[in-house]
Swiss-Prot record:
Residues 29-45 have a biased composition (Polar residues). It comes from Culex quinquefasciatus. GO terms for molecular function: ribonucleoprotein complex binding. Residues 1-237 are annotated as: Disordered. InterPro entries: BOP1/Erb1, BOP1_N_dom, WD40/YVTN_repeat-like_dom_sf, WD40_repeat_CS, WD40_repeat_dom_sf, WD40_rpt. Belongs to the WD repeat BOP1/ERB1 family. This is Ribosome biogenesis protein BOP1 homolog. WD repeats lie at residues 522-561, 563-603, 692-730, 733-772, 776-815, 831-861. It is found in: Nucleus, Nucleolus; Nucleus, Nucleoplasm.
Length: 861
């Protein structure tokens, strides 16, 4: 026992402990300072090396007992293992080089550490705070075994150490104290052996070299691996990353979890607990420390087998067979028959055509002299190296070039003679008396004359006299050539690519409709017209199946179907948000329908407003009464939502509302001078704005801001002032048949569609002619529409396409409108040469609705 203690003492001295720090408080009663729990970095590294040797030794000793293998593996450890003095020769040699003063400090500390419990009790209160600080500075990882303190014995350290200590320090009193402390330690070990029984010597070797650790006020963390869960994915609880973990040696925590809370280091086991665990735990030899969490991880059988195979120099993969049977992939036997016995192709026996062409090109180059033979090449090279001859008395061409006129401009040719200079000109070229008097009056100002001579007529060429002005004209010609400067006119050649205007990219002009989103199906015949509610929640459609349908925009669900009794050619939702009303042009009737969708109070208010007809004080004239009648609604139509019926004497093509929602106009193209009717809803009156017909009227449109009415005939568009009752201007689209038109929300630009595949953009402040013509469609254009908020307009054509374009109108009157085609949407199907009929934009969103001959309405977003 004493020998083992002295060995531990010498190993502690050889570890070269650090001098006490400022945090260590001086001991009372004149004792030396308290040694910290943890040793220096050098001792810690020595301990790690011994621990690895311990693990490898236990792995190699498969047949031995776990406790025995631990005892053998710990022989190189810092703890006292037994009386095997010969195995510690390396440590004895290191102990001979140790310093004497360090041994004195260690022995003194050991004596003080073995003091009575009363003294320890008195010091515990004073040093409790100091121990906590020491834990922060010197505590190591959780799974790392605790390094023992300086061994307190030195009396029987070995055959070589004791004589040296006695010879060096014979008069030192500290040596006596060290011997006394060793004797006390032997007494403690004897008492412990008596308690543990006959096997105590085997199980408690080196217990006395580990003083008990003081208990701190910290709670122990539960072992993460108590349940045997060693999943790699669940072990990553410390979020500090791949950093050196010794940075946390001075702190109570080892990192942070996923919630940002500190991971507190679990307290270290004292020496006795660790020794008991080493002796009793069968898995102690396969337990390693996780540096991230500080917990102990028990290696599985697969991990231990992997380590054994690596140490034995074998393949780490257990399934790999080093002695697999040899498979001869490529045989060494010579085959008698060929594996691939395909006959040669015919082209392998024929001369190559590509080589024939190359030879032909070389022969042609030789004939043309492009390819020189070797003799010709040498002859030309010798001639180039030989002397060069030139004319000695040859003129200097450089000076002559300087005297010449550079960039000579050819003299203009004289104009050829005309019919008036003929000797027998036509009679109309001869002067009459008035023209002759006028020519003679410019005698003093000859430059004002159209001709510088008087045309004359002779019967034959023999009668032509001598021309008296010949010499003078030659002289003037010479003066012109001599004195008049000449100049070149540079003709600017402009390519066609420069004539195309540079338009911005469509990506910079978003948002605009690009894809089909919803399809509204339900009609059984082609849908000619559509209109949307001012709030954008509901859509009304009119079809040739003699019904109108009201749809919910967001879900494409048909809410209501109302029969009209005839083909529906036009529908228009009232723009006034205070009433809920739809105007429908069906055959010769105009129906005002309350759809009863949306706000119930709004629908009730509309019914109350249209319940009673106002009394007319003025009787309508016969011209109006024979053309239009406001009649009562039948009971069946009243239940369907029809509130007012207006009968016309001709078929109605279009119905459109004024911006305020009180006036609406209807168009009857076959009614001649009574084609346009303007109706007032509040007074239930109708009137003809025009007394004469200026052509076959196609459609009308109210100005969004001013009291103006746009009337489109087949070839012209007239703008009338309804207040002054006069014609403001007449627009000339230069087309043969106008189909529809739409006005910009600001009212300064008009878009006209024709059946001739063209669209015309009119700037009303600029000219009566089109500002720009757009030829984007391949068939007749049925309808056009502007967006109320975004700079967008769209057109629908019989080529089943709907084209969305960008139309920006600037507030600056000096800047023209920017028109850029954006997207062609071809989703409708063609039926009987009909494609898309009508288009309308959503009032607030950049969405587009289109109706077609395929009985569908499509929403583009």
């Amino acid at each position: 026992m004493v020998a083992n203690k002295s060995k531990a003492t010498k190993r502690k001295v050889a570890a070269a402990p650090q001098p006490p720090t400022a945090q260590d408080k001086p001991a009372t009663n004149g004792r030396s300072t308290k040694q910290p729990e943890a040793d220096s970095d050098q001792s810690a590294s020595d301990y790690y090396e011994s621990d690895e040797e311990n693990l490898l030794a236990n792995i190699n000793n498969d047949d031995g007992d776990s406790s025995d293998s631990e005892g053998e593996g710990d022989a190189s450890d810092g703890e006292v293992q037994g009386l095997n003095i010969e195995s510690d020769s390396d440590f004895e040699e290191d102990d001979q080089e140790a310093d004497g003063e360090e041994e004195e400090e260690d022995s003194a500390d050991d004596v003080n550490s073995d003091s009575s419990p009363e003294e320890d009790e008195g010091e515990s209160e004073e040093e409790e705070e100091d121990d906590d600080e020491g834990d922060l500075e010197f505590e190591e990882d959780l799974a790392e075994p605790e390094k023992p303190r300086a061994i307190k014995e030195g009396s029987k350290a070995g055959k070589k150490q004791a004589p040296e200590v006695e010879s060096e320090e014979e008069d030192d009193l500290e040596t006596k104290k060290l011997l006394e402390a060793a004797a006390k330690e032997d007494e403690k070990l004897a008492a412990l052996d008596s308690v543990l029984g006959p096997d105590g010597e085997k199980k408690t070797r080196g217990v006395g070299s580990f003083p008990p650790e003081r208990k701190t006020g910290r709670l122990k963390n539960s072992d993460e691996y108590a349940g045997g869960d060693t999943s790699d994915e669940e072990d990553i609880r410390n979020t500090v990353g791949n950093i050196p973990m010794h940075w946390y040696d001075e702190y109570k925590h080892i990192g942070y979890d996923w919630d940002g809370n500190r991971l507190i280091k679990p307290p270290k086991m004292d020496t006795i607990d660790e020794f008991l665990k080493r002796m009793e735990d069968p898995n102690f030899w396969r337990t390693v420390k996780d540096p991230q969490t500080g917990q102990n991880v028990v290696l599985s059988d697969e991990d231990v087998g992997l380590i054994k195979r690596i140490m034995a120099g074998r393949n780490p993969d257990q399934q790999y067979n080093d002695y697999e049977p040899w498979i001869e992939w490529f045989t060494s036997e010579v085959e008698k028959m060929p594996i691939r016995n395909i006959p040669d192709h015919k082209r392998s026996f024929l001369p190559s055509k590509s080589e024939k062409q190359k030879i032909g090109r070389l022969v042609h180059a030789l004939k043309m002299g492009w390819v020189k033979t070797r003799a010709e090449t040498e002859r030309l090279a010798a001639a180039a190296k030989g002397p060069k001859f030139y004319m000695v008395w040859d003129s200097d061409h450089g000076k002559e070039d300087i005297r010449r006129i550079h960039d000579h401009v050819v003299a203009p040719k004289r104009p050829l003679p005309g019919h008036a200079e003929s000797y027998n000109p036509p009679p109309e070229y001869l002067f009459n008396e008035r023209e002759l008097a006028e020519w003679n009056s410019h005698e003093e100002e000859p430059w004002r004359r159209k001709l510088h001579y008087i045309p004359q007529k002779f019967n034959s060429l023999r009668e032509v006299p001598y021309y008296a002005q010949y010499v003078r004209e030659r002289f003037l010609r010479c003066l012109d050539l001599y004195l008049c400067p000449r100049g070149k006119r540079t003709r600017v050649t402009v390519g066609p690519e420069y004539l195309i205007p540079k338009l911005p990219s469509p990506k910079d002009l978003q948002p605009f409709p690009t894809l089909q989103n919803l399809v509204y199906r339900g009609h059984t015949d082609m849908i000619r017209t559509i209109s949307i509610e001012p709030k954008g929640e509901y859509l009304v459609t009119g079809s040739d199946d003699k019904t109108i349908k009201i749809w919910e925009v967001s879900t494409a669900r048909c809410i209501k179907t109302i029969p009209t009794g005839d083909v529906v050619r036009s529908v228009a939702w009232c723009p006034n948000v205070k009433i809920s009303l739809i105007a429908v042009a069906s055959g010769k009737r105009t129906l005002l329908i309350n759809p009863h969708v949306g706000d119930c109070l709004l629908s009730k208010k509309t019914d109350d407003l249209l319940a009673e007809a106002p009394k007319h004080e003025v009787v309508d004239n016969e011209r109006i009464s024979t053309a239009v009648q406001w009649v009562d609604v039948a009971e069946e139509e009243q239940k369907a939502g029809v509130r007012i019926v207006i009968n016309h004497f001709r078929e109605i093509k279009q119905v459109t509302w004024h911006g305020r929602g009180d006036y609406f106009a209807t168009v009857m193209p076959e009614a001649q001078n009574r084609s346009v009717l303007i109706h007032q809803l509040s007074k239930r009156r109708s009137q003809f704005p025009f007394s004469k017909s200026k052509g076959l009227i196609q459609c009308v449109l109210f100005h969004p801001v001013k009291p103006c009415l746009f009337v489109a005939t087949q070839r012209h568009i007239r703008v009338y002032d309804l207040v002054k009752q006069e014609l403001l201007k007449k627009l000339f689209p230069s087309c043969k048949w106008i189909s529809s038109m739409a006005i910009h929300p600001k009212g300064d630009n008009l878009l006209v569609a024709t059946y001739e595949k063209k669209m015309m953009w009119f700037d009303l402040d600029l000219s009566t002619r089109p500002y720009q013509q757009l030829k984007l469609h391949f068939s007749a254009i049925r309808n056009v529409a502007f967006h109320q908020r975004y700079p967008l307009f769209a057109s629908a054509s019989d080529d089943r396409s709907v084209i969305v374009s960008h139309g920006m109108v600037y507030n600056d009157l000096m800047q023209n409108a920017l028109i850029v085609p954006l997207r062609r949407l071809e989703n409708h199907e063609r039926v009987n040469d009909f494609g898309a009929f009508d288009v309308v934009f959503h009032p607030t969103q950049p969405w587009l609705f289109s109706s077609g001959a395929d009985n569908t309405v499509r929403l583009y977003t």
